[in-house]
């Protein structure tokens, strides 16, 4: 399998760059082709980059706690732009205040994200899960019609 292309960045008005650099390095070390949009990224910028590069996934991160607001409508915007089936991942400190992570995960999955990662999730696990998801999608796209 060719190295999967992923678009990463920090959404909204969030300017926390260090975690983004760590993600870029880890994903690159795990043979992802990383398109890193940096910080303060809009939904349209993620989607534009995914379309331009043929990315298999978009990885949204947020540290400042407003990811819940910044991510509203992301899946719908992907559908509207013709990439409705793209894998969407989100992680970090996604909401303000202390909440049970299962509530946060349910909320973001309800927004159309395929996986939601807590701030303390092991990045090795993240890479493994993303690769498995991407391989599964690519295999289903390659299967003859009726064999999926």
Curated annotation (Swiss-Prot):
Residues at which adenosylcob(III)alamin binds: 13-17, 61-63, 93-97
Reaction(s) the record says it catalyses? (2S,3S)-3-methyl-L-aspartate = L-glutamate
- List, alphabetically, the Pfam families matched: B12-binding
The record's keywords, sorted A to Z, are: Cobalamin, Cobalt, Isomerase, Metal-binding
InterPro entries from the entry?
A: Cobalamin-bd (IPR006158), Cobalamin-bd_sf (IPR036724), GlmS (IPR006394)
BP GO terms, sorted: anaerobic glutamate catabolic process; glutamate catabolic process via L-citramalate
The record's family statement is: Belongs to the methylaspartate mutase GlmS subunit family.
Please name the NCBIfam families in this protein's record: MthylAspMutase, PRK02261.1
Q: What is this protein called?
A: Glutamate mutase sigma subunit
- This chain's source organism reads Yersinia enterocolitica serotype O:8 / biotype 1B (strain NCTC 13174 / 8081)
